[in-house]
């Protein structure tokens, strides 16, 4: 387990800023202590410094996971967010999409959000902006990328994709072996 390099930090923060903007600083400097990001086996973990100090007593080969996995770096050095980061991203999300109850199950099975399943969308959402997807009861379901801007969503046909799926809470069941 090691700190992220300058390039890795830049790549990860660029990805996070698509979803939570400048609220990234609220993840690190929290009122309940200082938190940090650490890299272990190409995965980025988010943990308090107290847990980090305790984890240094464990050998690197024996350490499976520590803290919350925020995502992983691919072989091409791109950062991919994991669904385990949803609980930390949802409160700070700048742009949100609410899906109708009928479209929730489709999204949780890994499908994109169609215009017919769109309940609400945050004003001034740009095209290809990172969004957090909520149910109509304000329960975070996952995150994705807006396929259309807010203005385009108003006049598009009902079968058009408005949010590209990236991750959802259904992945806990579908990919339980690979989520650590």
Swiss-Prot record:
A biological process term (GO) from this entry: ribosome assembly
Region (C-terminal domain): 93-180
Compartments (UniProt record): Nucleus, Nucleolus
Annotated keywords: Nucleus, Ribosome biogenesis, RNA-binding
InterPro entries registered for this protein in UniProt: NIP7_N, Nip7_N_euk, PUA, PUA-like_sf, PUA_sf, Ribosomal_synth_fac_NIP7, UPF0113_PUA
PROSITE patterns: PUA
One GO MF term attached to the UniProt entry: RNA binding
One Pfam family matching this protein: pre-PUA_NIP7
An annotated GO cellular component: nucleolus
Residue span of region N-terminal domain: 1-92
Transmembrane domains' residue ranges: none
Every PUA domain range: 94-170
Function: Required for proper 34S pre-rRNA processing and 60S ribosome subunit assembly.
Assembly notes: Monomer. Interacts with pre-ribosome complex. May bind to RNA. Interacts with NOL8. Interacts with FTSJ3.
Record-linked PANTHER family: CYCLIN-DEPENDENT KINASES REGULATORY SUBUNIT/60S RIBOSOME SUBUNIT BIOGENESIS PROTEIN NIP7 (PTHR23415)
Recorded family membership: Belongs to the NIP7 family.
The protein's name in its UniProt record: 60S ribosome subunit biogenesis protein NIP7 homolog
Organism: Tetraodon nigroviridis
Species lineage: Eukaryota, Metazoa, Chordata, Craniata, Vertebrata
Gene name as annotated: nip7
